[in-house]
UniProtKB/Swiss-Prot annotation:
It comes from the Bacteria. This is Anaerobic nitric oxide reductase flavorubredoxin. It comes from Shigella dysenteriae serotype 1 (strain Sd197). Homotetramer. FMN binds at residues 260-264, 342-369. Pathway: Nitrogen metabolism; nitric oxide reduction.
Amino acid sequence: MSIVVKNNIHWVGQRDWEVRDFHGTEYKTLRGSSYNSYLIREEKNVLIDTVDHKFSREFVQNLRNEIDLADIDYIVINHAEEDHAGALTELMAQIPDTPIYCTANAIDSINGHHHHPEWNFNVVKTGDTLDIGNGKQLIFVETPMLHWPDSMMTYLTGDAVLFSNDAFGQHYCDEHLFNDEVDQTELFEQCQRYYSNILTPFSRLVTPKITEILGFNLPVDMIATSHGVVWRDNPTQIVELYLKWAADYQEDRITIFYDTMSNNTRMMADAIAQGIAETDPRVAVKIFNIARSDKNEILTNVFRSKGVLVGTSTMNNVMMPKIAGLVEEMTGLRFRNKRASAFGSHGWSGGAVDRLSTRLQDAGFEMSLSLKAKWRPDQDALELCREHGREIARQWALAPLPQSTVNTVVKEETSATTTADLGPRMQCSVCQWIYDPAKGEPMQDVAPGTPWSEVPDNFLCPECSLGKDVFEELASEAK
């Protein structure tokens, strides 16, 4: 089924509700995607792009229901990737002599995928035009490396529609085609996810290319993307967002992600986050266990953040494999204007944190001091983690911090209540872990200064995860 975009322009693409992986398995398309193809019917009939190769037969059959294939005068391929040009082989088998307009680099890519050098290719460059009748022209604009060397955009005069290729798109499937018809929160989340994970490496090219396009002084009433919605309501809003995202974007946000074998590094991550929040309550802090989180959501949060803390246990003297893989991906994304710090726990020997610090620096992050803990962090080690978080908050602050009274309050409470008043320390009879009322157990929201009698009944030993009934009064303090 086709959808009228504007006047004689129809959407003839394909929705893909089920797709969950893109670029292999590197991009999770949690809300599906669409492959947008457009049919322009003027004195000349023009098809702009096709769809993903897995929908080739369905696409050609649907297109045949819209138009006699022999009446298609021109095919424009803005991008040679298989989710754009995948149905070319099926289509060209029916109309083998139809001219294909694309960049020189696209010919190499198309032949590399379809192996038909005999097709009627016509090379276009920025500023070239194609007359399609009724006083309208197509104007071509090369956009190399946004995000492939062959990429270009196509502008239709008269209707003032920019067929923008991958730019301004999103992997987002909905029965509605236009931006003003869909859930706005979902839409802009997917726009930012798309930019963060696909276009970030090319941010330095985004601003000059947008400036070049605006320099043509052409009105833009609609932006018709290759994936997701068509921008008809205030289409320049997404252009303005791209200019913002391309300018070394950051929010007052810190992302923490880690991998852990025995929860030791997780304990460090939680304590660091507590220290950050104590010192700068205005900053947004997001924590992810990489083994249980959507990788693309982590990368989107890194893109949004002013800094990232990455944690890893040591395994065979190196970092955990999932951490190594994601840091390698961050290297390729070439984030700018961001700070980083490495942390992690180890046993008899370390090595992972130092290695991780080097990799983060190589990825272009401005490095802050790293933090290491041996074995499971005790209360003193967790306090060091909290202090590390406090120092990170101070170093990474984007504005003067509010004066904190946390330390003053703790000191006053400690001096007002003696250890003796809090009762005896308690020892786990299974693993020998000791509960000290003066220190509490912040990981379970048991505040310093909490007597054992006031510890909640659902308390679990941090070492062996058994309940309160296995605890006994420490022998040295028994009367």
